[in-house]
UniProtKB/Swiss-Prot annotation:
It comes from Idiomarina loihiensis (strain ATCC BAA-735 / DSM 15497 / L2-TR). Residues 396-565 form the tr-type G domain. One of the essential components for the initiation of protein synthesis. Protects formylmethionyl-tRNA from spontaneous hydrolysis and promotes its binding to the 30S ribosomal subunits. Also involved in the hydrolysis of GTP during the formation of the 70S ribosomal complex. The gene is infB. NCBIfam families: IF-2 (TIGR00487), small_GTP (TIGR00231). HAMAP family: IF_2_B. This is Translation initiation factor IF-2.
Length: 896
């Protein structure tokens, strides 16, 4: 036993040696400085100090006071003079802890009381059983007597009925013997009709009784469901109130006492309120109306004014071409959350602001029991466009030719020579600044030319499906060869499906080499006719006029093959080639008339704009009064600047044209949100139809020709039988607006290798939502394209065994059926996993686990070496010695 000196102990406990000696003396031990103190003496001193300071027992308090304070607000008065008063309720309770002996005595009394109560309950139960037995015997005797009496009465009635029937048959036989054969036949027929009528009446009465019984049963069932629902709500409300009841202590005894005191106070307050009301009613001899102040307002009635409909309300829901989920819910008078739940059950995950198409909205409306009324949002637009005077029979029209090519290859000079007018000299640096549209009367017929700066307008028209161009003339300088814009022109023409005529210009120069041009264009799959292809190559010189006639003949030959026809009378329609805001004349649009006759004063609906034509000018600036098919004209008088590619249509009524234009402007945003989603690498496979070859369209731009060829070759080799890589456009240099327009129109992605997009191209990317990606490592580019192609492949699934259990014994369960007592020998067994039952290593059943237990507890999984009980869904033929194989189906991600 460890001993310490008195000095050391005083230092440890933080007191003086003299004070410690005095405390030892009070405890009955004599000590002085320097003496040693053992463990037993320490315990004696500690016990003495506890008794001296009142801590002989537990340190818990014997009395506890709880205070509770609640605050609420009470509105006093009515009308404008009402005010709020803060009400504070304070409660104070004191709980006294019983001593151990009192607690023991109380528990003994409770035990005796419980035993006495159990004995009394047993006696009451026995007495009740004796009374029930006596009542049962009396009831049986009474029932037996009544049964015998009823049987006796029934026998007497049957005997009397037989006697009456015998007498009736005898009288009927006598009467029948006295009848003639005709009377006998009529009597038999009347008897048969009477029996048939009686059977029909009995059948109708039976059906009516069955219907009434079914109606009563249905009403009783509905009432039972309503009562059950109400009882469940009341029970939940009561549980919620109990849950919200706040106690100041965790002791169950204190909580019971607190609840009992609350109940007593509530009961007393209810009694006081009843007495006060009764006293007021007894003393109130005069009508309450007379006691009110004159002019005081009468209290409002609490009666509900809404009557529940007797049957579900079926509504006619009007659905436009697009409608949001929230608006559809409002039209059906249902909550948006309920509508979203319904669509989730139908397999559609939507939000409240998501736009639905007309077909989907109609299915949802029918699912909720309403009638969809499909409304065309553009009904007014169709009415305006249908109320037009169409022309008569079609007649041949002039071809519309678009001239394309690289900068400074002589496009405008070629047109200039054809028109015999020097237009190029007036333009900056001889480069076309805007779209020029000209029609030329030649000795071979009329031809309309579109001279484009680049290819933006042509791509825009192709993207809108305008089809304004009939033939493309590709101008290539014989001394310069194929250049980047030349390649872009070929790509645009092929994407639009427009026939191509190649004009090899500048043949009068010394360095002209037409064979080089043919070789370079053949690499772009533009094969000359003399090489076995289908493209006409015309060598010419815009400076000397050499080959111009051959070019015009080639154009007219191509137009004859296309058999171009249009109406030359009636209301005109066309397409906007270009538009601008002129400082002195306002919005000016160059319109190419495609059919009909356009006149000055006509009301034109042009995309989002409208207006009456105030003036018309041809390409030379000369004012004209009318223009027929394939004639380009400038028109003035529109409300705003239309977009290139918009359709221009002549209508009858200016007011309706304004309404249609305003509607289109309001609809523009909705259409932009609801239109088909652009191609993204993440969801490219969504556009792939089953069984078809998926195509990944790419517009590729690189910094140098070597990288471009290497990337193009690598991407093309990635194509498989299921996914095809289609490079629809490629080139060296920065990404331009033309590339973005081509990608937007062809549903492609734009890939840049060590190049960046121009500012205008970046703006167009945001507007058109085109997927634009930059790379600096060729392997990253190929890996991402390969990953996108892998996402477009059909998924593959594989079954993997995750556990094996051996059946040791079979038990019967009244709820589930046969329960297999198993030992898991391999892997893990999971609940609700698909399983196979094996007998002698042969699969005899395949299903899923319905129950998985371990020691009567439901578990989610059981691991190797553990016992468990397994219930197989819809299968009870499990025998000892069988094996249960648990597996799961996993999706294997396919790669190229």
């Amino acid at each position: 036993m460890e001993e310490v000196t008195l000095d050391k102990l005083a230092t440890d406990v933080g007191t003086t040696v003299d004070r410690l000696v005095q405390q030892f003396a009070e405890a009955g031990m004599t000590k002085k400085a320097g003496d040693s103190v053992n463990e037993e003496e320490k315990q004696k001193l500690l016990a003495h100090l506890n008794r001296q300071h009142g801590g002989g027992g537990s340190s818990e308090p014997s009395k506890m006071t709880l205070k509770r304070k609640t605050k609420s607000t009470l509105s006093v008065g009515g009308g404008r003079d009402s005010k709020s008063v803060q009400v504070e309720v304070r409660k104070k309770r004191t709980y006294v802890k019983r001593s151990a002996s009192e607690e023991q005595e109380r528990e003994e009394q409770e035990r005796l009381a419980q035993e006495k109560e159990a004995e009394e309950a047993k006696l009451r139960e026995e007495e009740k059983q004796r009374e029930e037995e006596q009542q049962r015997k009396e009831a049986e005797a009474k029932a037996k007597a009544e049964r015998e009496k009823a049987e006796k009465e029934k026998a007497e009635k049957e005997k009397l009925r037989k006697e009456k029937e015998k007498e009736r048959q005898k009288a009927e036989a006598e009467k029948r013997a006295a009848m003639t054969p005709e009377e006998r036949e009529a009597a038999d027929k009347a008897k048969a009709d009477a029996e048939k009528l009686k059977r029909q009446q009995e059948e109708e009465a039976r059906k009516k009784a069955e219907k009434e019984a079914e109606a009563q049963a249905e009403e009783a069932r509905k009432l039972a469901e309503e009562n059950a629902k109400r009882w469940e709500e009341e029970e939940q409300k009561r549980k919620q109130q109990e849950k919200e009841d706040v106690h100041f202590t965790t002791s169950s005894t204190a909580q019971e006492a607190e609840d009992a005191q609350d109940f007593d106070e509530e009961r007393k307050s209810r009694k006081r309120g009843k007495k006060r009301r009764r006293k007021d009613e007894e003393s109130d001899d005069t009508p309450r109306r007379e006691k009110r102040r004159k002019g005081a307002r009468r209290g409002s009635s609490l009666q509900q004014g809404f009557n529940k409909p007797a049957q579900p309300v079926e509504r006619d829901v009007k659905i436009g071409e697009t409608i949001t989920v929230g608006e559809l819910a409002n039209r059906m008078a249902v909550k948006a959350s309920d509508l979203i739940k319904t669509m989730m059950k139908m397999g559609e995950m939507v939000t409240i602001n998501q736009i639905l198409d007309q077909d989907t909205a109609a299915l949802v409306v029918e699912e909720l029991g309403h009638k969809p009324a499909l409304v065309k949002d553009n009904a007014l637009e169709e009415e305006v466009l249908s109320d037009r005077q169409e022309g008569g029979e079609e007649a041949p029209r002039a071809p519309v030719v678009t001239v394309m090519g690289h900068v400074d290859h002589g496009k405008t000079s070629l047109l200039d020579y054809i028109r015999k007018a020097k237009v190029a000299s007036g333009e900056a640096g001889g480069i076309t600044q805007h779209i020029g549209a000209y029609h030329v009367e030649t000795g071979h017929g009329m031809v309309t030319f579109l001279d484009t700066p680049g290819h933006a307008a042509f791509t825009s028209m192709r993207a809108r499906g305008a089809g304004a161009t009939d033939v493309v003339i590709l101008v290539v300088a014989a001394d310069d060869g194929v250049m980047p814009q030349t390649k872009e022109a070929v790509q645009h023409a092929k994407a639009a499906g427009v026939p191509l005529v190649v004009a090899i210009n500048k043949m009068d120069k010394e360095g002209a080499d037409p064979d080089r041009v043919k070789n370079e264009l053949s690499q772009l799959e533009v094969i000359p006719e003399d090489w076995g292809g289908d493209v006409q190559f015309i060598p010419l010189s815009a400076h000397t006029g050499e080959g111009i006639d051959e070019l015009l003949e080639a154009i007219l030959l191509q137009s004859e093959v296309l058999d171009l026809r249009a109406e030359k009378t009636g209301m005109a329609s066309g397409i906007v080639v270009e538009s601008r805001l002129d400082r002195g004349r306002g919005p000016v649009a160059t319109v190419l008339v495609q059919r009909g006759l356009l006149k000055q004063g006509d009301v034109v609906l042009c995309g989002l704009e409208y207006g009456r034509i105030r003036a018309m000018r041809d390409e030379t600036g000369k004012e004209i009064k009318e223009a027929g098919p394939s004639i380009p004209v400038e028109i003035l008088g529109l409300s705003g600047v239309p977009q290139a590619g918009d359709e221009a249509t002549v209508v009858r009524d200016e007011r309706k044209a304004r309404e249609v234009a305003n509607y289109r402007q309001g609809k523009y945003r909705d259409v932009k949100l609801a239109k088909q989603q652009k191609a993204k690498l993440e969801n490219m496979f969504a556009d792939m139809a089953e069984g078809d070859v998926a195509e990944l369209n790419i517009v590729l731009k690189s910094d140098v020709q070597g990288s471009l060829e290497a990337i193009s070759d690598a991407l093309t080799k990635l194509s498989t039988d299921e996914v095809k890589v289609n490079i629809i456009g490629s080139g060296v240099g920065g990404i331009t607006e033309t590339d973005i327009s081509l990608a937007s129109a062809s549903n492609a992605i734009v890939v840049g290798f060590n190049v960046r997009a121009e500012a205008a191209a970046r703006k167009l990317v945001e507007q058109e939502s085109v997927d634009l990606r930059y790379y600096s490592v060729i392997y990253d580019l190929i890996d991402e394209v390969k990953a996108a192609m892998s996402g477009m492949l059909q998924p593959e699934f594989k079954q993997q065994i995750i556990g094996l259990a051996e059946v040791r014994d079979v038990f019967k369960s009244p709820k589930i059926g046969a329960i297999a007592g198993c030992m898991v020998t391999e892997g893990v067994v999971k609940r609700s996993a698909p399983i196979r039952v094996l007998r002698d290593n042969v699969v005899i059943y395949e299903g899923e686990l319905e129950s998985l237990r371990r020691f009567k507890d439901d578990v989610q999984e059981v691991r190797n070496g553990m016992e468990c009980g397994i219930g197989v869904k819809n299968y009870n033929d499990v025998k000892e010695g069988d094996q249960i194989e648990v597996f799961e189906t996993i999706q294997i991600e396919r790669t190229l």
